[in-house]
Amino acid sequence: MMIESKGLIKTQSKAITKNQPTSCSVSINREKQRIFNEYGTFDNVLMSFAPSSQVGSKMPIGKAFKSNAPTLTYLDLCYGEGSAITWLVAWVSDVYGICGFVNNEATDNIKIMTANAIKDEYYFLNLNELITFFKMFIAGKFEKFYKKPNPQVITKSL
């Protein structure tokens, strides 16, 4: 009888934990739904937050912090692993280009490594915060490159 009770308890507890969403999973799903409702496809996110769509616009860091733009983590959660890197590579490429690196001085490998370093350390930042940083970096408000593209110059500035 005791063995049957333990088996029944084990079965019931598995069913309960399997069917009950946690408050964390509910919050994640709610945020994912908000992002899908606001931006739709990943292409829409890329277009809305692309370097070319930011020309002439300026957002103070306080407003960027309070914005509802998705974070790097939520880009991957909503649109698949690698989405954040895709978005970051576009911006990192823009930064290296504007800072004078041409003719493949900033290789694709350097751009991807820079994007990965940013994502790994700053996964919690939203896209508007990162855009504000990239614009300030381009404006010369942080570290400077010396002769060669160096991912640490960007990550150290961030």
Q: What is each residue range found by the language model?
A:
Residues 1-158:
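Charged interaction scaffolds used for protein-protein
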